[in-house]
């Protein structure tokens, strides 16, 4: 419901090729409620909505704008891949059209009143640009607001040294939350001016502040936002926008009134019955002023009406007739694998030549972005490693301290020092080296240990055999004092293995 306040805003949602719907809405507002556009404090827009808002603020002919919408959609449909064909340059088409139709002082009319929704590439935040220093800045703001990544190109355009992309990514319907903002959208939902689909589904999807009801018609509209429909469908969308604009004006009592604040009668106390009768009479009066369905095209601008009628007429020249024949169409389809690379190469060459003036700035930006991405990846990897290594390293050190064997002269320190640093710091490799060191010790001990065991008889010590002494005289006094001589024998020591380890 439109609030009866002193100030109000108008906001147009982004919708791609469905922007022809806004041409019908804007034509209705200019014709039946010009004060609503002239006295609006701000007019906002995103993507295709920004083009419509710019046209309303600067006074561009809506008929020419609608004709351009249909012309661009027809050019896109001529190609095999539609708007994705390399020869179709949407950014170039928008810039050339705005250069042609915008007046030289358009930035003066737009500054402070026009708001264009943009998405900043560096942080993804939404930015609303409302001050423009020149006509070129106004055109560049519209180009940035309609630049869809990958769909329109890979390198985003810049405005005042900052890179921006489509404003619908971050905020597709600026200032929708304010009560004094008239929201316009080609998708049925909760916007003030939008199609009224007869659907029983109460569920809705809110995409970047845009209310979209779940139904088949909205799904069809979403599919045609980036891939334009047929001219007949565009004509019906323009008529639908005109009808929805009339419905909004009638519902809020703004139809054919110079100013809603001046046209309202003075307030006076009255009962509930009088209030109901007044509302019914106002509705009946407004409904009587609505044009019929068959005469809607008569109320559109003459240039737009002519463009819509021409779009529905099939050309009858000889070349078009031949190209529409089935054999010619089959031959054209079969030649696509051969003609498409040639067309792509030609289009790439033309775009490269047009890109040459901006090459230094774009290369510098790509270098900065590549460095930022690499730095982010390195910092993220460091955080992950720092989170896992401190928890595992103390346990690993403690296990090595407990399970280590006595050091030997032949250790693995030399081998570890010979390895790269990243291999020495790897825990799994350290475990493998420790196990290899243990196996090496066992092999060395088994190789150089010798069990030298001698029989006990070999270690028994015996006295050397002396020559037999001369028989002594038993009668001598020495023989009588000495007595019998005992046997000389030494007990054999226990046999012990002699361990000899070379170098151990």
UniProtKB/Swiss-Prot annotation:
Q: Quote the protein name from its UniProt record.
A: Patatin-like phospholipase domain-containing protein 2
> Which residues carry out catalysis?
47 (nucleophile), 166 (proton acceptor)
- Topology, Extracellular side: 30-42, 159-329
Q: Which ranges belong to the motif GXSXG?
A: 45-49
Cite the record's note on assembly: Interacts with ABHD5; this association stimulates PNPLA2 triglyceride hydrolase activity. Interacts with SERPINF1; this interaction stimulates the phospholipase A2 activity of PNPLA2. Despite a colocalization in lipid droplets, it probably does not interact with PLIN. Interacts with PLIN5; prevents interaction with ABHD5. Interacts with FAF2.
Activity regulation here? Answer: The triglyceride lipase activity is inhibited by BEL ((E)-6-(bromomethylene)-3-(1-naphthalenyl)-2H-tetrahydropyran-2-one), a suicide substrate inhibitor. No differences in the acylglycerol transacylase was detected in the presence or absence of ATP.
Please name the PANTHER family in this protein's record: CALCIUM-INDEPENDENT PHOSPHOLIPASE A2 IPLA2 -RELATED (PTHR12406), PATATIN-LIKE PHOSPHOLIPASE DOMAIN-CONTAINING PROTEIN 2 (PTHR12406:SF29)
Tissue expression per record: Highest expression in adipose tissue. Also detected in heart, skeletal muscle, and portions of the gastrointestinal tract. Detected in normal retina and retinoblastoma cells. Detected in retinal pigment epithelium and, at lower intensity, in the inner segments of photoreceptors and in the ganglion cell layer of the neural retina (at protein level).
């Amino acid at each position: 419901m439109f609030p009866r306040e002193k100030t109000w805003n108008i906001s147009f949602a982004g919708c791609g090729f469905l922007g022809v719907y806004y041409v019908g809405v804007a034509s209705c507002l200019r014709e039946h409620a010009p004060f609503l556009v002239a006295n609006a404090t701000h007019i906002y827009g995103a993507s295709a909505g920004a083009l419509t808002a710019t046209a309303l603020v600067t006074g561009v002919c809506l008929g020419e704008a609608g004709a351009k919408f249909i012309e661009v959609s027809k050019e896109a449909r001529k190609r095999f891949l539609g708007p994705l064909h390399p020869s179709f340059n949407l950014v170039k088409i928008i810039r050339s059209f705005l250069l042609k139709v915008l007046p030289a002082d358009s930035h003066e009319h737009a500054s402070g009143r026009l708001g264009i929704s943009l998405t900043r590439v560096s942080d993804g935040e939404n930015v609303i640009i409302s001050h423009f220093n020149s006509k070129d800045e106004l055109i560049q703001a519209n180009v940035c607001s309609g630049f869809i990544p990958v769909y329109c190109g890979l390198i985003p355009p810049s405005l005042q040294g900052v890179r921006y992309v489509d404003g619908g990514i971050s905020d597709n319907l600026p200032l929708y939350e304010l009560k004094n903002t008239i929201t316009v959208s080609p998708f049925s939902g909760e916007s003030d001016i939008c199609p009224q689909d007869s659907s029983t589904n109460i569920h809705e999807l809110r995409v970047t502040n845009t209310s979209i009801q779940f139904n088949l018609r909205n799904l069809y509209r979403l599919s045609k936002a980036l891939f334009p429909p047929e001219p007949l469908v565009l004509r019906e969308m323009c008529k639908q926008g005109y009808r929805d604009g009339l419905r909004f004006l009638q519902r809020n009592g703004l139809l054919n009134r110079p100013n809603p604040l001046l046209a309202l009668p003075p307030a006076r106390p009255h009962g509930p019955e009088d209030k109901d009768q007044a509302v019914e009479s106002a509705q009946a009066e407004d409904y009587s002023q609505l044009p019929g369905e068959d005469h809607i095209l008569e109320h559109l601008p003459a240039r737009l009406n002519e463009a819509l009628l021409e779009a529905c007429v099939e050309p009858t020249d000889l070349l078009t007739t031949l190209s529409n024949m089935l054999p010619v169409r089959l031959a054209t389809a079969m030649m696509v694998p051969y003609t498409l690379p040639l067309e792509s190469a030609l289009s790439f060459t033309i775009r490269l030549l047009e890109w040459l003036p901006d090459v230094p700035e774009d290369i510098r930006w790509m270098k900065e972005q590549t460095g930022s991405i690499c730095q982010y990846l390195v910092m993220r990897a460091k955080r992950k490693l720092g989170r896992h290594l401190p928890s595992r390293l103390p346990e690993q050190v403690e296990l090595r301290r407990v399970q280590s064997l006595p050091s030997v002269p032949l250790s693995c320190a030399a081998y570890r020092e010979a390895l790269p640093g990243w291999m020495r710091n790897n825990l799994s490799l350290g475990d493998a080296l420790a196990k290899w060191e243990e196996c090496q010790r066992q092999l060395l001990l088994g190789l150089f240990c010798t069990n030298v065991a001698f029989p006990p008889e070999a270690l028994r010590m015996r006295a050397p055999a002396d020559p037999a002494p001369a028989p002594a005289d038993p009668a001598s006094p020495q023989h009588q004092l000495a007595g019998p001589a005992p046997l000389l024998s030494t007990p054999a020591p226990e046999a012990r293995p002699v361990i000899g380890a070379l170098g151990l």
